[in-house]
Amino acid sequence: MDLSEMRTRLRTDLHDEDAANYRWTDAELDRHIDRTVREFSLALPLEATATLTTAAGSRDLSIASLSDLVAIEAVEYPVGEYPLSFVRYSVWLNTLTMLIESTPSGGEDVSVYYTTLHTLDVSSSTIPPRFEDVIAGAAGGYAAVEWSSFATNRVNVGGQDVWRDYLTWGRERLADFQRDLAKHGRRNAVRVRRLYPPAAAPADQSTVQGP
């Protein structure tokens, strides 16, 4: 399903199919779709692999070329061994540092396993088909909630409470979206793997890092 097909699906769900009297412009719907895809990507990102090349005498690798990066998952070095040889690493801004004893020679391959944002554009989509309904529902929810805010205290053809109906419908769709993310998101998925983690776990509100 490409962007145009998703937009059409959205208009059907929102009962906004009268081209002469659209409630939402294409640009507005595209914005809600883009927001939904980004939020979906943070919970269920697209898995990818890139091959980077070492510089002589340096453990650092630039990851600036990894567009729409969500997270680095693992670093394989040297490549081509069996079992695969994963190394510890640290990341700061656009630099990945392999935490290895000896410095690499120049021109060696390093496989970086990472996750990235999904794409949904005019020609293609990386959203798994089974989640297209999830994207459509949430994007419709955002559109309905936004329109209800705009329509409050305005005269509407559907009646004075039509904004409230859209608000309720939109909130229900967004609640469904959050439940789907919680159910299918990577944090709740059982992933059997043995990869080396980053050098330090990211801090959160439950982590105390003292001297």
Model feature map: region roles:
Residues M1-T12, A27-L42, Y82-P211:
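Internal mixed-charge
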Residues R11-N21:
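Structural recognition of short helix-loop-helix hairpins that underlie histone-fold modules
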Residues A19-Y22, D121-S123:
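A generic structural signal for short coil/turn motifs at secondary-structure boundaries
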Residues A20, A56-S58, E81, G159:
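Intrinsic-disorder/low-complexity loop/linker signature
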Residues Y22-D60:
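N-terminal interaction modules that seed assembly of large macromolecular complexes
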Residues P45, A56, S65-D68, L93, ...:
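A generic structural signal for short, non-catalytic loop/turn and secondary-structure boundary residues
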Residues A50-S67, D121-P129, V157:
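Surface-exposed ligand/attachment interfaces on beta-rich extracellular proteins
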Residues S62-E81:
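Solvent-exposed beta-hairpin/edge-strand motifs
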